[in-house]
Amino acid sequence: RDVRDLLNVKDIRLFNMFLKLCAGRIGSVFNASEIAGEIGVSSKTIQAWVSILQASYVVYLLPPYFENSRKRLTKSPKMYFCDTGLACTLLGIESAEQLAFDKMRGHLFENLIVVELLKRRLNEGKESNLYFYRDSNQNEVDILVNNGSSLDAIEVKSAMTYNPSFEKALLKVNEWVNPPVGKRT
């Protein structure tokens, strides 16, 4: 209610639809224009809504990692909910049993891990050092932790069993992050 008041939302139905669409896109690259088109408001309105949700710790935008910090400011982030319970409610998930078989299970687990890493960092009085990585070949790692002198890559999976394919993107990113001496481009 406070967020809606801050935004002076005139049509609560559209704002609720926006929240549900965001919950359905957890862990995906955020595209304001796409959401705006789906609910019939301007991209500027969506950006304003996201800004307030971010400032009030309802959502967290995970930026992409680029060595060039200017690119980090212009490329699209991924959106996560700071409260996975809220995300589940927006998705209509009412029990652990339902979650166990829901198509969003993996995304919600990724959301939980990202937000817990973020909270740990913020509770230490530090700014976020979390990113995600995706290259032009669609190699993607869910989380990169920038430790100043090194990067730690984390791939989040909710699967009950290990599959060697889970390592593919991690190995590719590790080649880029930790190249042999003299091979970094």
Tell what function each PLM region has:
Residues R1-A55, L61:
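Conserved helicase/translocase motor-coupling segment
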Residues A48-V59, P63-T185:
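A cross-kingdom feature that marks ATP-driven nucleic-acid transaction machinery
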